[in-house]
Protein backbone atom coordinates (compact mmCIF):
# COMPACT_ATOMS: atom_id res chain seq x y z
CA UNK A 1 0.00 0.00 0.00
CA UNK A 2 1.62 3.28 -1.09
CA UNK A 3 2.15 5.96 1.50
CA UNK A 4 0.81 9.46 0.96
CA UNK A 5 3.03 12.50 1.39
CA UNK A 6 2.01 13.17 5.01
CA UNK A 7 2.66 9.60 6.12
CA UNK A 8 6.03 9.59 4.32
CA UNK A 9 6.97 12.80 6.14
CA UNK A 10 5.88 11.25 9.44
CA UNK A 11 8.01 8.14 8.79
CA UNK A 12 11.04 10.26 7.85
CA UNK A 13 10.56 12.40 10.98
CA UNK A 14 10.29 9.31 13.22
CA UNK A 15 13.37 7.65 11.73
CA UNK A 16 15.30 10.96 11.76
CA UNK A 17 14.57 11.32 15.48
CA UNK A 18 15.96 7.82 16.10
CA UNK A 19 19.03 8.48 13.93
CA UNK A 20 19.71 11.77 15.74
CA UNK A 21 20.05 9.86 19.05
CA UNK A 22 21.88 6.88 17.57
CA UNK A 23 25.52 5.84 17.79
CA UNK A 24 25.17 2.92 15.38
CA UNK A 25 23.13 2.09 12.28
CA UNK A 26 23.22 -1.38 10.71
CA UNK A 27 21.75 -2.36 7.33
CA UNK A 28 20.83 -5.95 6.54
CA UNK A 29 19.16 -7.55 3.54
CA UNK A 30 16.16 -9.59 4.59
CA UNK A 31 15.13 -11.21 1.29
CA UNK A 32 13.38 -14.56 1.89
CA UNK A 33 12.92 -14.29 5.67
CA UNK A 34 9.63 -15.61 7.01
CA UNK A 35 7.28 -13.42 9.01
CA UNK A 36 7.86 -15.60 12.09
CA UNK A 37 11.62 -15.13 11.90
CA UNK A 38 11.24 -11.39 11.39
CA UNK A 39 8.97 -11.25 14.45
CA UNK A 40 11.64 -13.05 16.52
CA UNK A 41 14.26 -10.56 15.30
CA UNK A 42 12.03 -7.64 16.27
CA UNK A 43 11.45 -9.13 19.73
CA UNK A 44 15.21 -9.50 20.31
CA UNK A 45 15.74 -5.95 19.07
CA UNK A 46 13.11 -4.61 21.48
CA UNK A 47 14.81 -6.40 24.40
CA UNK A 48 18.09 -4.63 23.57
CA UNK A 49 16.44 -1.23 22.91
CA UNK A 50 17.30 -1.39 19.21
CA UNK A 51 14.99 0.44 16.81
CA UNK A 52 14.41 -2.00 13.96
CA UNK A 53 12.52 -0.90 10.87
CA UNK A 54 11.87 -2.03 7.31
CA UNK A 55 11.44 1.05 5.19
CA UNK A 56 11.84 2.34 1.68
CA UNK A 57 15.41 3.24 0.87
CA UNK A 58 14.45 6.69 -0.43
CA UNK A 59 12.85 7.49 2.93
CA UNK A 60 15.88 6.12 4.77
CA UNK A 61 18.20 8.31 2.67
CA UNK A 62 16.14 11.36 3.62
CA UNK A 63 16.23 10.36 7.29
CA UNK A 64 20.04 10.12 7.41
CA UNK A 65 20.62 13.24 5.32
CA UNK A 66 22.73 15.76 7.22
CA UNK A 67 23.75 13.27 9.93
CA UNK A 68 27.01 11.40 10.51
CA UNK A 69 25.27 8.39 8.90
CA UNK A 70 24.77 10.14 5.53
CA UNK A 71 27.62 8.17 3.85
CA UNK A 72 25.51 5.02 4.35
CA UNK A 73 23.12 6.27 1.64
CA UNK A 74 25.34 4.68 -1.02
CA UNK A 75 24.72 1.25 0.56
CA UNK A 76 20.93 1.62 0.66
CA UNK A 77 19.86 -0.64 -2.19
CA UNK A 78 17.62 -3.68 -2.18
CA UNK A 79 15.21 -4.84 0.52
CA UNK A 80 16.81 -3.67 3.76
CA UNK A 81 15.99 -3.71 7.43
CA UNK A 82 17.55 -0.90 9.47
CA UNK A 83 18.83 -1.44 13.01
CA UNK A 84 19.39 1.81 14.90
CA UNK A 85 20.65 2.02 18.48
CA UNK A 86 21.90 4.51 21.03
CA UNK A 87 24.17 1.79 22.44
CA UNK A 88 27.33 1.54 20.36
CA UNK A 89 27.15 -2.21 19.83
CA UNK A 90 23.53 -3.27 20.44
CA UNK A 91 22.28 -2.99 16.84
CA UNK A 92 25.33 -4.77 15.46
CA UNK A 93 25.05 -7.51 18.09
CA UNK A 94 21.31 -8.14 17.52
CA UNK A 95 21.61 -8.28 13.73
CA UNK A 96 24.85 -10.30 13.78
CA UNK A 97 23.54 -12.86 16.29
CA UNK A 98 20.34 -13.31 14.28
CA UNK A 99 22.23 -13.64 10.99
CA UNK A 100 24.25 -16.52 12.48
CA UNK A 101 21.09 -18.57 12.98
CA UNK A 102 19.29 -17.38 9.83
CA UNK A 103 21.29 -17.39 6.59
CA UNK A 104 18.64 -15.32 4.79
CA UNK A 105 19.50 -12.21 6.83
CA UNK A 106 22.64 -10.81 5.24
CA UNK A 107 24.50 -7.96 6.90
CA UNK A 108 25.20 -5.38 4.24
CA UNK A 109 26.83 -2.42 5.99
CA UNK A 110 26.84 -0.31 9.11
CA UNK A 111 28.05 2.97 10.48
CA UNK A 112 29.60 3.87 13.82
CA UNK A 113 30.98 7.29 14.76
CA UNK A 114 30.52 8.52 11.19
CA UNK A 115 32.55 5.70 9.67
CA UNK A 116 30.96 3.28 7.21
CA UNK A 117 31.70 -0.38 7.92
CA UNK A 118 31.35 -3.42 5.72
CA UNK A 119 30.00 -6.78 6.91
CA UNK A 120 33.31 -7.68 8.62
CA UNK A 121 33.34 -4.34 10.45
CA UNK A 122 29.80 -4.86 11.74
CA UNK A 123 30.69 -8.38 12.89
CA UNK A 124 33.81 -7.10 14.66
CA UNK A 125 31.73 -4.42 16.41
CA UNK A 126 29.17 -7.06 17.44
CA UNK A 127 31.88 -9.19 19.08
CA UNK A 128 32.95 -6.42 21.46
CA UNK A 129 31.59 -7.08 24.97
CA UNK A 130 28.78 -4.81 26.12
CA UNK A 131 29.37 -1.98 28.59
CA UNK A 132 27.82 -4.02 31.40
CA UNK A 133 30.08 -7.01 30.66
CA UNK A 134 33.16 -4.78 30.63
CA UNK A 135 32.17 -3.12 33.92
CA UNK A 136 31.61 -6.49 35.61
CA UNK A 137 35.03 -7.72 34.42
CA UNK A 138 36.64 -4.52 35.71
CA UNK A 139 34.91 -4.91 39.06
CA UNK A 140 36.10 -8.53 39.31
CA UNK A 141 39.69 -7.48 38.55
CA UNK A 142 39.51 -4.69 41.14
CA UNK A 143 38.04 -6.99 43.81
CA UNK A 144 40.54 -9.84 43.33
CA UNK A 145 43.46 -8.26 45.26
CA UNK A 146 41.18 -7.12 48.09
CA UNK A 147 39.55 -10.53 48.50
CA UNK A 148 42.96 -12.23 48.35
CA UNK A 149 44.24 -9.93 51.09
CA UNK A 150 41.14 -10.62 53.19
CA UNK A 151 41.64 -14.40 52.82
CA UNK A 152 45.31 -14.04 53.84
CA UNK A 153 44.33 -12.06 56.95
CA UNK A 154 41.69 -14.65 57.85
CA UNK A 155 44.21 -17.48 57.45
CA UNK A 156 46.73 -15.59 59.61
CA UNK A 157 44.12 -14.97 62.31
CA UNK A 158 43.16 -18.65 62.24
CA UNK A 159 46.80 -19.67 62.57
CA UNK A 160 47.30 -17.33 65.56
CA UNK A 161 44.22 -18.76 67.28
CA UNK A 162 45.52 -22.28 66.68
CA UNK A 163 48.88 -21.40 68.25
CA UNK A 164 47.25 -19.69 71.26
CA UNK A 165 45.09 -22.71 72.06
Curated annotation (Swiss-Prot):
Entries under CDD domains matching the protein: Ribosomal_L10 (cd05797)
InterPro entries registered for this protein in UniProt: Ribosomal_uL10 (IPR001790), Ribosomal_uL10-like_sf (IPR043141), Ribosomal_uL10_bac (IPR022973), Ribosomal_uL10_bac_type (IPR047865), Ribosomal_uL10_CS_bac (IPR002363)
Listed GO CC annotations: large ribosomal subunit
GO terms of biological process kind: translation
Keywords: Ribonucleoprotein, Ribosomal protein, RNA-binding, rRNA-binding
SUPFAM superfamilies on file: Ribosomal protein L10-like (SSF160369)
Record carries keyword Ribonucleoprotein: yes
GO molecular-function terms, A-Z: large ribosomal subunit rRNA binding; structural constituent of ribosome
Coiled-coil blocks: none
Subunit structure: Part of the ribosomal stalk of the 50S ribosomal subunit. The N-terminus interacts with L11 and the large rRNA to form the base of the stalk. The C-terminus forms an elongated spine to which L12 dimers bind in a sequential fashion forming a multimeric L10(L12)X complex.
Cited function: Forms part of the ribosomal stalk, playing a central role in the interaction of the ribosome with GTP-bound translation factors.
Database matches in NCBIfam families: PRK00099.1-1 (NF000955)
Family: Belongs to the universal ribosomal protein uL10 family.
UniProt protein name: Large ribosomal subunit protein uL10
Amino acid sequence: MPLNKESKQAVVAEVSAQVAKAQTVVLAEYRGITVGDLTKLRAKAREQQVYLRVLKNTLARRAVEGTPFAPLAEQMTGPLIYGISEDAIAAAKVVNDFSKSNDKLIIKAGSYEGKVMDKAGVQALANIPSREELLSKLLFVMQAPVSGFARALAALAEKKQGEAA
